[in-house]
Amino acid sequence: MPANNQRANLIKMHGSIDWFLCDKGYVWRVRENDLYPKADRRVLIYPQATKYVATQQDPFSTQFDLFRKSLNSSNSNMLAVCGYSFGDDHINNEIEFALSKAENKTVLLAFLECRDEIPPCLEKWRSDSFGSRVIIASIHGLYIGKEGPFKRKEKDDYWWTLKGVTSVLKNGCEV
């Protein structure tokens, strides 16, 4: 644990391509140079109609519980989201429930390419009472609550990528 008691939780809500179920029922992660077991032992939630039911079973229920506890902490939190399209109501409901609590200090930072439009739930949240705590870094620019998009003066505007965010954190951003 860092000296300042800050921590980061990396929560893979739908599993990972490097998670496998061993014969004893434990989930383990394949590391570099490990031999990959059979693909049918992979622990993933695939995009299908039974996705919600699968999230109610371990190891996913444990991940979801950690997600819920992290969101509902009374401490200042940053929920940084990448690789998620905001298409799962059960996840969106948890985020919205946490953000809507008056005592909640969580800030949502969503990294989205979204070439067409911002997902409907994010559009709704931007206009809500907690909208100032909803930040969207997208191909169209940076949105902070109802404001935006703000674009950087640079020709190559790539906020929504790890490289772009790292650049902004390191060099600041001129809009």
Task: Spell out what each predicted region is.
Residues 1-45, 55:
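Extended, H/D-rich, highly charged conserved domains that either
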Residues 53-54, 65-175:
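SIR2/sirtuin-family catalytic core signature
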